[in-house]
Regions:
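Extended effector regions of multi-domain proteins
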Residues: 1-233
Length: 233
Protein backbone atom coordinates (compact mmCIF):
# COMPACT_ATOMS: atom_id res chain seq x y z
CA UNK A 1 0.00 0.00 0.00
CA UNK A 2 1.15 3.51 -0.80
CA UNK A 3 -1.85 5.40 0.58
CA UNK A 4 -5.35 4.80 1.90
CA UNK A 5 -7.14 2.43 -0.49
CA UNK A 6 -4.28 2.77 -2.98
CA UNK A 7 -1.86 -0.02 -3.79
CA UNK A 8 1.15 -0.23 -6.03
CA UNK A 9 1.95 -3.53 -7.77
CA UNK A 10 5.43 -4.96 -7.37
CA UNK A 11 7.18 -4.83 -10.73
CA UNK A 12 10.54 -4.77 -12.50
CA UNK A 13 12.33 -2.22 -14.67
CA UNK A 14 14.95 -3.55 -17.11
CA UNK A 15 17.55 -1.91 -19.30
CA UNK A 16 20.20 -3.34 -21.59
CA UNK A 17 23.46 -1.66 -22.56
CA UNK A 18 24.84 -2.70 -25.94
CA UNK A 19 28.62 -2.25 -25.65
CA UNK A 20 30.40 -2.67 -28.98
CA UNK A 21 33.86 -3.02 -27.49
CA UNK A 22 37.00 -2.09 -29.38
CA UNK A 23 39.80 -2.17 -26.82
CA UNK A 24 42.99 -0.92 -28.45
CA UNK A 25 41.82 -1.93 -31.90
CA UNK A 26 40.12 -5.01 -33.29
CA UNK A 27 40.27 -8.48 -31.83
CA UNK A 28 38.88 -8.58 -28.29
CA UNK A 29 38.37 -11.46 -25.84
CA UNK A 30 36.16 -11.66 -22.74
CA UNK A 31 37.32 -13.48 -19.61
CA UNK A 32 35.30 -14.18 -16.48
CA UNK A 33 36.94 -13.70 -13.08
CA UNK A 34 35.97 -14.70 -9.53
CA UNK A 35 37.46 -14.71 -6.04
CA UNK A 36 37.75 -18.19 -4.53
CA UNK A 37 39.01 -19.10 -1.02
CA UNK A 38 41.95 -21.49 -1.05
CA UNK A 39 41.56 -24.67 1.05
CA UNK A 40 43.68 -25.20 4.13
CA UNK A 41 47.04 -26.73 3.28
CA UNK A 42 50.79 -26.25 3.13
CA UNK A 43 50.31 -23.26 0.82
CA UNK A 44 47.62 -21.81 3.10
CA UNK A 45 48.65 -22.65 6.68
CA UNK A 46 46.70 -19.77 8.24
CA UNK A 47 43.55 -20.17 6.15
CA UNK A 48 43.50 -16.58 4.93
CA UNK A 49 44.54 -17.06 1.29
CA UNK A 50 42.15 -16.62 -1.60
CA UNK A 51 42.73 -16.80 -5.34
CA UNK A 52 41.28 -15.25 -8.47
CA UNK A 53 40.08 -17.52 -11.24
CA UNK A 54 39.98 -16.69 -14.92
CA UNK A 55 38.33 -18.43 -17.84
CA UNK A 56 37.90 -17.43 -21.45
CA UNK A 57 34.40 -17.15 -22.90
CA UNK A 58 35.03 -18.68 -26.30
CA UNK A 59 31.56 -19.14 -27.80
CA UNK A 60 28.24 -17.32 -27.53
CA UNK A 61 26.33 -20.00 -25.63
CA UNK A 62 29.05 -20.10 -22.98
CA UNK A 63 28.90 -16.33 -22.63
CA UNK A 64 25.31 -15.95 -21.39
CA UNK A 65 26.23 -15.32 -17.77
CA UNK A 66 24.71 -14.44 -14.40
CA UNK A 67 26.34 -12.19 -11.80
CA UNK A 68 27.43 -13.63 -8.45
CA UNK A 69 27.92 -11.24 -5.56
CA UNK A 70 29.34 -13.99 -3.32
CA UNK A 71 32.39 -14.43 -5.56
CA UNK A 72 32.65 -10.86 -6.86
CA UNK A 73 32.27 -12.13 -10.42
CA UNK A 74 33.31 -9.67 -13.09
CA UNK A 75 34.21 -9.74 -16.76
CA UNK A 76 37.29 -8.36 -18.46
CA UNK A 77 37.29 -7.29 -22.10
CA UNK A 78 40.87 -7.24 -23.35
CA UNK A 79 42.95 -7.16 -26.51
CA UNK A 80 45.09 -10.34 -26.44
CA UNK A 81 47.15 -9.14 -29.39
CA UNK A 82 48.86 -6.37 -27.40
CA UNK A 83 50.75 -6.11 -24.13
CA UNK A 84 50.68 -3.37 -21.55
CA UNK A 85 53.53 -1.95 -19.46
CA UNK A 86 53.64 -5.02 -17.20
CA UNK A 87 53.21 -7.66 -19.88
CA UNK A 88 49.47 -8.24 -19.65
CA UNK A 89 46.68 -7.61 -22.12
CA UNK A 90 45.18 -4.09 -22.00
CA UNK A 91 41.52 -4.13 -21.11
CA UNK A 92 38.52 -2.89 -19.19
CA UNK A 93 36.42 -4.78 -16.68
CA UNK A 94 32.65 -4.78 -16.46
CA UNK A 95 31.43 -4.57 -12.86
CA UNK A 96 27.72 -5.21 -12.43
CA UNK A 97 25.17 -5.13 -9.65
CA UNK A 98 23.81 -8.67 -9.03
CA UNK A 99 20.21 -7.46 -9.06
CA UNK A 100 17.27 -9.84 -9.67
CA UNK A 101 16.81 -11.02 -13.23
CA UNK A 102 13.47 -11.58 -14.96
CA UNK A 103 11.11 -13.07 -12.38
CA UNK A 104 8.23 -13.85 -14.75
CA UNK A 105 7.70 -17.58 -15.31
CA UNK A 106 8.91 -19.59 -18.31
CA UNK A 107 6.28 -19.42 -21.03
CA UNK A 108 4.91 -16.03 -20.02
CA UNK A 109 4.68 -13.35 -22.69
CA UNK A 110 6.85 -11.01 -20.65
CA UNK A 111 9.67 -13.53 -20.34
CA UNK A 112 9.49 -14.80 -23.92
CA UNK A 113 9.58 -11.29 -25.35
CA UNK A 114 12.13 -9.95 -22.87
CA UNK A 115 14.50 -12.91 -22.84
CA UNK A 116 17.50 -10.59 -22.68
CA UNK A 117 16.66 -10.00 -19.00
CA UNK A 118 17.23 -13.65 -18.05
CA UNK A 119 21.03 -13.12 -17.98
CA UNK A 120 23.15 -10.26 -16.68
CA UNK A 121 25.79 -10.55 -19.42
CA UNK A 122 25.77 -11.79 -22.99
CA UNK A 123 28.63 -11.71 -25.50
CA UNK A 124 27.97 -12.01 -29.22
CA UNK A 125 29.94 -11.71 -32.42
CA UNK A 126 29.36 -8.31 -33.98
CA UNK A 127 26.57 -8.21 -36.55
CA UNK A 128 25.31 -4.79 -37.66
CA UNK A 129 21.79 -6.22 -38.01
CA UNK A 130 21.69 -7.24 -34.32
CA UNK A 131 20.97 -3.88 -32.74
CA UNK A 132 18.38 -4.53 -30.06
CA UNK A 133 18.51 -6.83 -27.04
CA UNK A 134 14.83 -7.76 -27.38
CA UNK A 135 14.74 -7.93 -31.17
CA UNK A 136 13.39 -5.44 -33.66
CA UNK A 137 9.70 -5.70 -32.71
CA UNK A 138 9.39 -6.99 -29.12
CA UNK A 139 5.71 -6.11 -28.77
CA UNK A 140 4.59 -8.31 -31.66
CA UNK A 141 7.06 -11.18 -32.06
CA UNK A 142 6.05 -14.61 -30.78
CA UNK A 143 8.99 -14.84 -28.39
CA UNK A 144 12.62 -15.83 -28.41
CA UNK A 145 13.89 -12.98 -30.54
CA UNK A 146 16.78 -10.74 -29.60
CA UNK A 147 19.67 -12.00 -27.50
CA UNK A 148 18.41 -15.58 -27.05
CA UNK A 149 18.28 -15.92 -30.84
CA UNK A 150 21.60 -14.16 -31.40
CA UNK A 151 23.40 -16.34 -28.86
CA UNK A 152 21.82 -19.56 -30.17
CA UNK A 153 24.04 -19.25 -33.26
CA UNK A 154 26.96 -20.11 -30.95
CA UNK A 155 29.49 -18.18 -33.01
CA UNK A 156 33.12 -17.96 -31.86
CA UNK A 157 33.79 -14.81 -29.82
CA UNK A 158 37.47 -15.16 -28.94
CA UNK A 159 39.88 -12.57 -30.36
CA UNK A 160 37.33 -11.09 -32.72
CA UNK A 161 34.91 -8.18 -33.13
CA UNK A 162 32.45 -8.60 -30.25
CA UNK A 163 29.49 -6.95 -28.55
CA UNK A 164 29.02 -7.16 -24.79
CA UNK A 165 25.41 -6.78 -23.66
CA UNK A 166 24.60 -6.00 -20.03
CA UNK A 167 21.07 -6.37 -18.64
CA UNK A 168 20.36 -4.50 -15.43
CA UNK A 169 17.47 -2.93 -13.65
CA UNK A 170 15.45 -2.41 -10.51
CA UNK A 171 12.89 -4.65 -8.83
CA UNK A 172 10.42 -2.22 -7.30
CA UNK A 173 8.31 -2.91 -4.23
CA UNK A 174 6.12 0.17 -3.92
CA UNK A 175 6.09 2.06 -0.62
CA UNK A 176 4.34 5.16 0.77
CA UNK A 177 7.41 7.29 0.05
CA UNK A 178 6.88 6.64 -3.68
CA UNK A 179 3.58 8.55 -3.70
CA UNK A 180 2.49 10.92 -5.13
CA UNK A 181 5.90 11.52 -6.76
CA UNK A 182 8.49 8.77 -6.65
CA UNK A 183 12.04 9.71 -5.56
CA UNK A 184 15.09 8.72 -7.57
CA UNK A 185 16.21 5.09 -7.75
CA UNK A 186 19.62 4.24 -9.18
CA UNK A 187 20.59 1.36 -11.45
CA UNK A 188 23.76 1.02 -13.46
CA UNK A 189 27.16 -0.55 -13.91
CA UNK A 190 30.84 0.38 -14.18
CA UNK A 191 33.53 -0.05 -16.81
CA UNK A 192 36.96 0.23 -15.19
CA UNK A 193 40.38 0.15 -16.86
CA UNK A 194 42.41 -2.95 -16.00
CA UNK A 195 45.93 -2.78 -17.36
CA UNK A 196 44.87 -0.27 -19.99
CA UNK A 197 46.99 2.58 -18.60
CA UNK A 198 50.57 2.41 -17.36
CA UNK A 199 49.70 4.35 -14.18
CA UNK A 200 46.84 6.22 -12.52
CA UNK A 201 45.23 8.10 -15.40
CA UNK A 202 44.16 10.89 -13.05
CA UNK A 203 47.71 12.01 -12.27
CA UNK A 204 47.79 14.57 -15.08
CA UNK A 205 44.44 16.14 -14.19
CA UNK A 206 45.06 19.67 -12.86
CA UNK A 207 44.05 20.06 -9.24
CA UNK A 208 41.88 22.86 -7.94
CA UNK A 209 43.74 25.31 -5.73
CA UNK A 210 42.01 26.63 -2.64
CA UNK A 211 43.45 30.04 -1.69
CA UNK A 212 42.58 29.43 1.96
CA UNK A 213 44.57 26.17 2.11
CA UNK A 214 48.17 27.09 2.97
CA UNK A 215 51.13 25.42 4.61
CA UNK A 216 51.17 25.96 8.35
CA UNK A 217 54.59 27.66 8.14
CA UNK A 218 53.22 30.34 5.85
CA UNK A 219 51.26 33.40 6.89
CA UNK A 220 47.67 32.86 5.88
CA UNK A 221 46.15 35.45 3.57
CA UNK A 222 43.71 37.95 4.97
CA UNK A 223 40.23 36.56 5.01
CA UNK A 224 37.79 38.34 2.69
CA UNK A 225 34.78 40.08 4.11
CA UNK A 226 31.86 37.87 4.90
CA UNK A 227 31.59 34.35 6.22
CA UNK A 228 34.24 31.79 5.28
CA UNK A 229 34.85 28.24 6.34
CA UNK A 230 37.04 29.38 9.24
CA UNK A 231 36.04 32.97 10.04
CA UNK A 232 32.85 34.77 10.81
CA UNK A 233 32.39 38.08 9.04
Amino acid sequence: MVDDNLGGPTHQHFFNARLHMDIDGGGNTVTEHEFVPRPWGRDNPHGNVFDTTSRVLSRERDAARVANGETGRYWKIANPNLTNSVGGAPGYKLVVNPSPLMLAQEGSFVRSRGGFATKHVWVTAFDPAEKYASGDYPNVHAGGDGLPRYAAQNRPIENTDIVVWHSFGHTHVCKPEDFPVMPVEYAGFMLKPVGFFSANAGFDVPVDRNARSVRSAHTPPAAPAGDTCCHKG
